[in-house]
A protein has these predicted regions:
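Extended assembly/interaction regions that build large supramolecular complexes
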Residues: 1-202
Length: 202
């Protein structure tokens, strides 16, 4: 754990991270990730704060904010089956965000399969704006040995949806192998933010 107070920089920071030896119930279930709280009263980030478990939304980047590893879990059920997951939550002076992702994979040599799903969402306060996305994918394959050589057969299916507002609109995508079908929905107008302060939002 790290705690830092600097009157010259106008910064108060608390940050912690799980070690490489962190596990849940038994050693095969590994845990990763970190936590941070910071507030500034001087400098370019004066008046801002951040509280995060596991980091930030993929599109959210701010200079000077603490870098925090995703909260994650990796469970090696057996030599062939692995379950991995990650998540984050963050509240800052300008936005609220959260997300999760999970992947289950199995590899038996002659056959394999993977299932993955996840979601991300972020809401900005001023101007008011939100965006969110969710996805799911499944893929599988087999290897067949013949007198002519090894034949590999695989298939993959996926779906993804993205939305944003306040002029609600979005896009849905269906993926079948290398092909995809995209459908747009909602407003076609340019999104204009509605100014909402932190006090009004909460």
């Amino acid at each position: 754990m790290l705690a830092r107070f600097s009157s010259s920089e106008g910064l108060f920071l608390i940050q912690a991270q799980l070690t490489d030896n962190s596990w849940l119930l038994y050693p095969e279930v590994r845990l990763t990730g970190g936590f941070a709280f910071a507030t500034w009263w001087l400098g370019p980030n004066a008046g801002q704060f951040v509280l995060t478990l596991g980091g930030y939304h993929p599109s959210f980047q701010r200079d000077g904010y603490p870098i925090v590893a995703r909260l994650g879990l990796q469970w090696r059920v057996s030599n062939a089956i692995v379950i991995k997951g990650g998540s984050y939550f963050a509240l800052t002076s300008e936005a609220l965000m959260a997300g999760v992702e999970v992947e289950v994979s199995a590899d038996f040599g002659f056959a394999w399969a993977r299932i993955a799903f996840g979601a991300n969402a972020i809401v900005y306060f001023d101007p008011f704006y939100f965006m969110a996305d969710a996805y799911a994918r499944i893929s599988a394959g087999v290897k067949i040995k013949t007198f002519l050589g090894t034949i590999r057969i695989s298939i993959s299916l996926g779906a993804r949806i993205e939305v944003e507002g306040p002029d609600f609109r979005g896009k849905a995508t269906i993926e079948v192998g290398p092909c995809d079908i995209k459908v747009k929905f909602g407003s076609s107008r340019e999104i204009r933010g509605i100014f909402v302060g932190w006090d009004e939002f909460v």
